[in-house]
UniProtKB/Swiss-Prot annotation:
Record's protein name: Protein teg
EC number of this enzyme: 3.1.1.-
Disulfide topology: none
GO molecular function ontology, one term from the record: hydrolase activity
Chain location of the short sequence motif GXSXG per the record: 42-46
Organism encoding this protein: Priestia megaterium (strain ATCC 14581 / DSM 32 / CCUG 1817 / JCM 2506 / NBRC 15308 / NCIMB 9376 / NCTC 10342 / NRRL B-14308 / VKM B-512 / Ford 19)
Name of a matching Pfam family: Patatin
Residues spanning the membrane: none
Keywords: Hydrolase, Lipid degradation, Lipid metabolism
Encoding gene, per UniProt annotation: teg
Active-site residues, as the UniProt record annotates them: S44 (nucleophile), D169 (proton acceptor)
Amino acid sequence: MTKYRIITFDGGGTLGALSLQLLNRLAYQNPKLISETNVFSGNSIGSFTALALASGRSPEETFDFFKDQILPAFSVSRPGGPVFNQQVPYSGLIKAIRTFFPRDLRLRDLKKRIVVPAFHLFAPELNRWNPVLFHNFLGSPYLNEKASDVILRSSAAPATQRAYQNYVDGYTVATNTSTASIAFAVGKAKQPLDQIAVLSIGTGEQPTQLRRDTKGWGMVSADNILPEDMEDLPPNWGVLLDRSPNEPLLPFLQIISGGSSYYESMVSSELLGDQFFRLNPRIPNFSKTDPSVVPALISIANKTNLRPAFQFIERNWN
């Protein structure tokens, strides 16, 4: 019987509705799923879910707040964003997160262990920038950090939002936090690999692809061309203004976030074998900042066959 149980949540902005509805279905079928979990981890919007559960909130309560308070923060899109301007005003998300979590709630106060990635743009003690894995395992240097600050640091996506307290989104470190969570279970909780089970919940597998010839591409233009009119900007690694429906708007950034998620799943699966389960249904190429996609995401979550996930939980959580 597996003894050390971990649930991870990917980042994905408004796509977090998919993982939250999947979680609610799983928890309804398995009432002890949350209470029997040792570690909750997540990146960006997944860090909100992870810390909400770790603080004692139910999946239903967490999803209700997401729909009622967090989604409206994404409803305002600035002109030119995310290519020429910060896309989403960050003030709405800051207010929502600080409303949900008590102002004085620290990582040391959480009822469960957590792991949350972010990227520190300047770490004075190192005199450089640095990836950070916030956690509350024994001996953590982050125990006094506010839960709300940790979530907002992990959710500050470049181009979409601004940096928060000189940190940017955890997807620059790990979109999928499965491998990091396994590492903490082994290194901090002293658990052998054969006693660890991970349920990794994504925000949807999209058909993102890039088939065109990338010869000559730079980060903001191509073939040393500086267009006089930005509407005629040639394709490049920074932005595709002439993209097809399944091509990435921001190729370089989306390669980092998408590639990281697949990589983490592959490594975690190699480490744990059948004690790792990835739940990440296929979805259309939805925007991560568009609240209008949420009803479709909920519908996809409700139609997803969860029998394999139920069987995995039955083997490892009961």
